[in-house]
Amino acid sequence: VSRYVLDTGIVLGFLRGAPYARHVIDTYDPLSPPNLAVQSVVSVAELESLGFKNKWGQQKLDKLDELVRKIPIQDINHPAILRKFSEIDAYQENKHPSLSIPSGKSGFKLGDNDIWIAATASAMQAVILTTDKDFLPLNNVFATVIYIDPNGCK
Protein backbone atom coordinates (compact mmCIF):
# COMPACT_ATOMS: atom_id res chain seq x y z
CA VAL A 1 0.00 0.00 0.00
CA SER A 2 1.39 3.37 -1.01
CA ARG A 3 0.05 6.85 -0.31
CA TYR A 4 0.59 9.62 -2.82
CA VAL A 5 -0.05 13.32 -3.06
CA LEU A 6 -0.30 14.26 -6.72
CA ASP A 7 1.01 17.72 -7.42
CA THR A 8 -0.70 20.08 -9.82
CA GLY A 9 1.51 19.10 -12.76
CA ILE A 10 0.65 15.42 -12.41
CA VAL A 11 -3.10 16.11 -12.32
CA LEU A 12 -2.70 18.46 -15.29
CA GLY A 13 -0.94 15.63 -17.14
CA PHE A 14 -3.92 13.36 -16.46
CA LEU A 15 -6.23 16.07 -17.79
CA ARG A 16 -4.18 16.45 -20.97
CA GLY A 17 -3.59 12.73 -21.48
CA ALA A 18 0.15 13.43 -21.44
CA PRO A 19 2.62 10.54 -21.90
CA TYR A 20 4.13 11.23 -18.48
CA ALA A 21 0.70 10.75 -16.90
CA ARG A 22 0.52 7.27 -18.48
CA HIS A 23 4.01 6.61 -17.06
CA VAL A 24 2.75 7.58 -13.58
CA ILE A 25 -0.21 5.20 -13.89
CA ASP A 26 1.88 2.35 -15.28
CA THR A 27 4.74 2.74 -12.80
CA TYR A 28 3.06 3.81 -9.54
CA ASP A 29 -0.62 2.93 -10.03
CA PRO A 30 -1.65 5.69 -7.62
CA LEU A 31 -5.37 5.63 -8.39
CA SER A 32 -5.94 1.92 -7.80
CA PRO A 33 -6.60 0.33 -4.41
CA PRO A 34 -4.96 -0.50 -2.15
CA ASN A 35 -2.89 2.56 -3.10
CA LEU A 36 -4.28 5.92 -2.10
CA ALA A 37 -3.76 9.13 -4.04
CA VAL A 38 -5.05 12.55 -3.08
CA GLN A 39 -4.67 16.03 -4.45
CA SER A 40 -4.41 19.10 -2.29
CA VAL A 41 -7.25 21.58 -2.43
CA VAL A 42 -4.45 23.97 -3.45
CA SER A 43 -3.87 21.98 -6.65
CA VAL A 44 -7.57 22.10 -7.44
CA ALA A 45 -7.50 25.89 -7.04
CA GLU A 46 -4.39 26.14 -9.24
CA LEU A 47 -6.08 24.09 -11.97
CA GLU A 48 -9.29 26.13 -11.77
CA SER A 49 -7.20 29.29 -12.03
CA LEU A 50 -5.28 27.91 -15.01
CA GLY A 51 -8.55 27.11 -16.77
CA PHE A 52 -9.95 30.55 -16.02
CA LYS A 53 -6.83 32.43 -17.18
CA ASN A 54 -6.48 30.33 -20.34
CA LYS A 55 -10.19 30.51 -21.16
CA TRP A 56 -10.63 26.75 -21.35
CA GLY A 57 -13.77 25.73 -23.16
CA GLN A 58 -16.68 23.99 -21.46
CA GLN A 59 -15.56 20.55 -22.64
CA LYS A 60 -12.14 20.89 -20.98
CA LEU A 61 -13.69 22.38 -17.83
CA ASP A 62 -16.12 19.45 -17.67
CA LYS A 63 -13.20 17.05 -18.05
CA LEU A 64 -11.41 18.86 -15.21
CA ASP A 65 -14.50 18.60 -12.98
CA GLU A 66 -14.74 14.88 -13.72
CA LEU A 67 -11.06 14.34 -12.93
CA VAL A 68 -11.24 16.39 -9.73
CA ARG A 69 -14.13 14.20 -8.55
CA LYS A 70 -12.10 11.01 -9.19
CA ILE A 71 -9.11 12.02 -7.06
CA PRO A 72 -9.91 12.71 -3.40
CA ILE A 73 -9.23 16.28 -2.32
CA GLN A 74 -7.33 16.90 0.90
CA ASP A 75 -8.17 20.15 2.63
CA ILE A 76 -5.31 22.09 4.23
CA ASN A 77 -7.34 23.09 7.30
CA HIS A 78 -5.86 20.36 9.49
CA PRO A 79 -3.53 20.91 12.48
CA ALA A 80 -0.85 18.50 11.20
CA ILE A 81 -0.79 20.14 7.77
CA LEU A 82 -0.66 23.63 9.28
CA ARG A 83 2.28 22.55 11.46
CA LYS A 84 4.15 21.00 8.53
CA PHE A 85 3.64 24.20 6.52
CA SER A 86 5.43 26.13 9.28
CA GLU A 87 8.25 23.59 9.46
CA ILE A 88 8.82 23.48 5.69
CA ASP A 89 8.69 27.26 5.42
CA ALA A 90 11.32 27.55 8.18
CA TYR A 91 13.45 24.79 6.63
CA GLN A 92 13.59 26.43 3.20
CA GLU A 93 15.03 29.55 4.86
CA ASN A 94 17.41 27.42 6.97
CA LYS A 95 15.62 28.61 10.13
CA HIS A 96 14.21 25.28 11.29
CA PRO A 97 15.19 24.68 14.93
CA SER A 98 16.24 21.06 14.43
CA LEU A 99 16.73 20.50 10.69
CA SER A 100 19.49 22.06 8.63
CA ILE A 101 19.84 22.38 4.89
CA PRO A 102 22.72 20.19 3.68
CA SER A 103 26.19 21.68 4.02
CA GLY A 104 27.16 23.95 1.18
CA LYS A 105 23.56 24.97 0.45
CA SER A 106 22.17 28.33 1.48
CA GLY A 107 18.45 27.72 1.23
CA PHE A 108 15.89 27.48 -1.49
CA LYS A 109 12.54 29.00 -2.29
CA LEU A 110 9.23 27.23 -2.64
CA GLY A 111 6.07 29.11 -3.45
CA ASP A 112 3.40 28.96 -0.77
CA ASN A 113 1.23 26.69 -2.91
CA ASP A 114 4.07 24.17 -3.18
CA ILE A 115 4.64 24.37 0.58
CA TRP A 116 0.96 23.52 1.13
CA ILE A 117 1.22 20.53 -1.21
CA ALA A 118 4.41 19.33 0.50
CA ALA A 119 2.91 19.90 3.95
CA THR A 120 -0.07 17.78 2.96
CA ALA A 121 2.21 14.94 1.86
CA SER A 122 4.38 15.22 4.95
CA ALA A 123 1.41 15.17 7.33
CA MET A 124 -0.05 12.15 5.51
CA GLN A 125 3.34 10.40 5.33
CA ALA A 126 2.74 10.21 1.60
CA VAL A 127 5.00 10.31 -1.43
CA ILE A 128 4.89 13.46 -3.56
CA LEU A 129 4.55 12.66 -7.26
CA THR A 130 5.57 15.83 -9.05
CA THR A 131 6.70 17.37 -12.32
CA ASP A 132 8.28 20.23 -10.36
CA LYS A 133 11.96 20.03 -9.36
CA ASP A 134 11.34 22.68 -6.69
CA PHE A 135 10.18 19.89 -4.36
CA LEU A 136 13.48 17.98 -4.56
CA PRO A 137 15.21 19.71 -1.60
CA LEU A 138 12.48 18.23 0.62
CA ASN A 139 13.19 14.65 -0.50
CA ASN A 140 13.79 12.35 2.47
CA VAL A 141 13.50 15.31 4.83
CA PHE A 142 9.75 15.90 4.95
CA ALA A 143 8.52 13.38 2.39
CA THR A 144 9.73 11.14 -0.36
CA VAL A 145 9.68 13.14 -3.58
CA ILE A 146 9.46 11.39 -6.93
CA TYR A 147 10.19 13.72 -9.80
CA ILE A 148 8.54 12.83 -13.10
CA ASP A 149 10.17 14.51 -16.08
CA PRO A 150 7.27 15.71 -18.24
CA ASN A 151 9.55 15.68 -21.28
CA GLY A 152 11.17 12.34 -20.55
CA CYS A 153 8.19 10.09 -21.23
CA LYS A 154 7.32 10.08 -24.90
Predicted features along the sequence, with ranges:
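Short, well-structured N-terminal submotif of metal-dependent ribonuclease cores
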Residues: 1-40, 49-66
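Generic structural signal for small/hydrophobic residues in well-ordered secondary structure
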Residues: 7-8, 47, 85, 121
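Short, hinge-like loop/turn segments at secondary-structure boundaries
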Residues: 54-58, 92, 146-149
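Active-site neighborhoods of divalent-metal-dependent phosphate/nucleic-acid chemistry enzymes
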Residues: 73-127
